[in-house]
Amino acid sequence: MDILIVTPRADFWNGLNGVFEKRGASVRTACAMPEALASLKEKKAALAVLDLFGGEAWNGAEHADAMKKAVISILMQDAMTNTASVCGMGEETFHDAMEGLGMINDLPAQPSEADVEDLMSRLRVILGQA
């Protein structure tokens, strides 16, 4: 299973690669959406993790608009790519802001190994691998 992480902080995510690999996933990164879309065109991903704001605190409408555009761009490239955000906006805000986009969940701005484990468990359920 291939995971694409869109992030300006690849070093941070490199520290979590072991969690993905333990679940049988390979990880690649893209520093911005144009690179991510080009990467998806070359090779599909089971999941795109959108860490667009580099660990910044949730900024409301501005971040919501950017996240929606990113998710829609990915779905237009490949509608089978699952997505998750990294904003730490909280469950209620996440559901209100991202309603209808079919995203798995929102991770905290500084995800832990446990957060990644939870995300991978959810993805496996969606993919019928649980």
Show the residue positions of the predicted features.
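Two-component/phosphorelay signaling modules centered on CheY-like receiver
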Residues: 10-29
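Alpha-helical interaction/dimerization surfaces of two-component signaling modules
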Residues: 18-20, 39, 97
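Acidic, metal-coordinating helix/loop segments flanking the phosphotransfer/catalytic sites
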Residues: 31-47, 55-56
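Conserved phosphotransfer cores of two-component systems
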Residues: 41-43, 73-81, 101
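Conserved phosphotransfer microenvironments
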Residues: 49-77, 91-93
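Alpha4 helix (beta4-alpha4-beta5 surface) of REC/receiver domains from two-component response regulators
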Residues: 62, 82-108
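C-terminal output helix
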Residues: 93, 111-127
